[in-house]
Amino acid sequence: MRKIIGIAAATVVVAGLAGCSSAADESAAPANCTPVLGAADLAEEGTLTIATNATLPPMQYVDADGEVIGMRVDLGKEIAERLCLRPKFVNIEFEAQIPGVQSGRWDMIDTGMFYTPERAETIDLVPYEVQAVSISVPAGNPESISTVDDLAGKTIGVEAPGYEFDTLTALAERFATEGKPALTVQTFKTNADAYQALSAGQIDGTSIVESVTSFYQQDGRFETAVGGINEAPLAMGFAKGSKSAAEVARVLSEMRGDGYLPDLFEQYGVTAYEGDIAVSTGPLDS
């Protein structure tokens, strides 16, 4: 089992569309460090406010003590430290994250968001990681799903909106065109809700990135039936023209060079993005 490192010295905010509540503030910006980002660049002076959807273990999730932990939380904390800022994590569903970063409620989206050219027209993106969509099923694979085409006639759950939902929707449309049995795409507010439905036998499978399906199969209740679907880069997200986007890209490039990022990815079994770590606003060159 991969080692999961919890975060320390970071504020966690649990947020919803109707409001939010804050955990105790136990953190401070690093000493002897001058931030490049000032009050005009941040939602809160001296703080890097980071939106994440903590329902995707081991990438980001809430542990038994109520702490938000995981690879992307570790990464967000390290980014904040290198920017001489205090990290504050806002745990909120993905559908609220892009409007929130656009309106300045938080500075950065760090939730495993897939890079798409359409999304890059809406917010600034910094690619850094690569993932593919997978299908998770109950242990024993009772529906004998082993290929994408085996999803015809099945009901697959997915968090929506998102890249995985778009992938399944496109697949359902292809099946319809080809005259195959319908793929029913059942949407959920969070990935955790989809897994609860899968555990209860309400759906045949659920769709999420490979690192998450691999984690869920560790306790023997689920297994990954299909992987490697629509592999693509993942990115941090920022408001258009945000100074923080350029600074985070700089820090991520620094992490790649000094070994922090490769070591973190190896620990969690994640594939690194091989292109330039830079602010992107349209189709990627690589």
Question: What is the predicted role of each segment?
Answer:
Residues A28-T111:
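Extracytoplasmic small-molecule ligand-binding "clamshell" domains
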Residues G76-L83, E164-T187:
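Ligand-binding cleft/hinge of the Venus flytrap
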Residues K88-P99, E143, L183-Q196, A232:
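Short helix-initiation/N-cap motifs at beta->coil->alpha
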Residues S21, V73-R82, N141-P142, D149-D150, ...:
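Extended ligand-binding regions for polar small-molecule ligands
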Residues A96, G112-A120, T169-L171, S199-N230:
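A ligand-binding cleft/hinge motif common to bilobed small-molecule-binding domains
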Residues A15-G19:
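C-terminal motif of bacterial Sec signal peptides marking the signal peptidase cleavage site
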Residues K77, R86-D149:
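Acidic, polar ligand-binding/catalytic clefts
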Residues A54, V130-V137, S214, Q218-S253, ...:
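Periplasmic-binding protein-like
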